[in-house]
Amino acid sequence: MAWSAGQYVKFEDERTRPARDLLAQVPLTRIDRAIDLGCGPGNSTELIVERYGVAGVSGLDSDDNMLEAARARMPGTDFVKADLATWLPDEPVDLLFANAVFQWLPNHLEIFDRLMDGLKSGGVLAIQMPDNLTEPSHLMMEETAKNGPWSDAFAKKSVRRNPLPAPSVYYNRLIGKSARIDLWHTNYNHALENAAAIVEWVKATGLRPYLDHAGAEHRDAFTADYLARIEKAYPPLTDGKVLLRFPRLFLVAVKK
């Protein structure tokens, strides 16, 4: 599945805030090498460089469009194409940082376990993932998929990503290799202009697999059906805006 950097950065401030909150809890005062996993257009990589300096910081992504945007944004930083499902650093590093990428990989628990082996002693695995499948924004994707001329395609194959395990599952999986693990949830409430803005937000991420699977011939109708459901699920506030509630899970593991 291809991603769109242009669509993603429409809400860059809101998308970058969780990366900033995650980085604030990384207990490293200096690094020799840090890698931004699933770097996207480079907005999270930029934060790492601002904190630790450009030397030793690189980004990694599997999408050519995102990598092109990241390289244009930060020409002095190395960005590499790689598959996170199998990737490991060539030598132990200080920080492996990932903002909103691993929710797409069903076996990310196994990947986290392996990534711990790619850290120096005292190194940090820092992860943030959306935990929003029970929010109306995502429930309405499933409702739309089940109702319409595209429903047969979704009956044959679901595109819904797997729900995240409980925090205790992450803790138990990683504590054997960790000196300390911090786990927490944050619920962001983003004030957006209207229901259409919610649709624009999710078109870059969660809605994209649904639109692709519905097919080009149904894309506009699927989007319109979804928007109608979102308008009912997110009533306007007194100033006409809507609140998009967005729960996210954070994990910071320090290697023994």
UniProtKB/Swiss-Prot annotation:
- Organism for this UniProt entry: Rhizobium rhizogenes (strain K84 / ATCC BAA-868) (Agrobacterium radiobacter)
List localization entries: Cytoplasm
Q: Which reaction does it catalyse?
A: trans-aconitate + S-adenosyl-L-methionine = (E)-3-(methoxycarbonyl)pent-2-enedioate + S-adenosyl-L-homocysteine
**GO MF term set:** trans-aconitate 2-methyltransferase activity
Top class in the EC scheme: transferase
Going by the UniProt record, its keywords in alphabetical order are: Cytoplasm, Methyltransferase, S-adenosyl-L-methionine, Transferase
What is stated as this protein's family in its record? Belongs to the methyltransferase superfamily. Tam family.
Identify one Gene Ontology CC term for this UniProt entry. Answer: cytoplasm
Please explain the role this protein plays, according to its UniProt record.
Catalyzes the S-adenosylmethionine monomethyl esterification of trans-aconitate.
NCBIfam families registered for this protein in UniProt: PRK01683.1
- The protein's name is Trans-aconitate 2-methyltransferase
Question: Which EC number(s) are documented for this chain?
Answer: 2.1.1.144
| Keyword field contains Transit peptide | no
UniProt-listed GO biological process terms: methylation
Q: Has the keyword Disulfide bond been applied to this entry?
A: no
Name the InterPro entries for this protein. Methyltransf_11, SAM-dependent_MTases_sf, Trans-aconitate_MeTrfase, Trans_acon_MeTrfase_C
